[in-house]
């Protein structure tokens, strides 16, 4: 199973909610009539409208190192270059890079020594010691923080990105993306998947029970060579019959003279 690493591009999901959620943008949250901070949007959508984040190391020397429960990192939103940080019980998106923007993963399986994409975990803020928690405040869904929360509302899971990679995994039926379903229209065997190249995966496929299996890889932008060959012969055949028809017409006209 593939380990989660510093530098990975990920989608952030909450898989244990009655309706699983995915981070998919940001919106102003007013703290005073004329003052606001951005908070992440959560929806029951899919990778198609999901918002990806980079697991940014605090120490540059940790780049590409696999995470463990002691690893500390920031979560940087790719589209806006903003960081998730905990402030007064609400998780915001901003430019803060102090310890309130530092996070660690606490696996649901407390015996885990490394963390891979199959695992669920809690996000623990290093500045406050609180867990990130899904909440609804005034009919608005957001991420708050609470010390030692043990509910399903604080259980998270990362899906490896970027979007093109996640898209290919959905089209291959990778169960990490389909259970719960975060694929939307990108379902294995669907018409939208026919033109999407596959990407190498170390995750289990829905169609196999083998963990660590590797899917075949098709280069980006390529089509099966048999299709190209068939199209070529159709064109050559069409040109041949057009030439035959022209010769036949000329012969008939010559005979009628």
Curated annotation (Swiss-Prot):
Keywords: Glycoprotein, Host membrane, Membrane, Transmembrane, Transmembrane helix, Virion. GO terms for cellular component: host cell membrane; membrane; virion component. The chain crosses the membrane at residues 233-253. It comes from the Viruses. The lineage of its organism: Viruses, Varidnaviria, Bamfordvirae, Nucleocytoviricota, Megaviricetes. The keyword Transmembrane applies. This is Uncharacterized protein L778. It is a single-pass membrane protein. It is found in: Host membrane; Virion. Glycans are attached at residues 61, 95, 102, 111, 139, 148, 152.
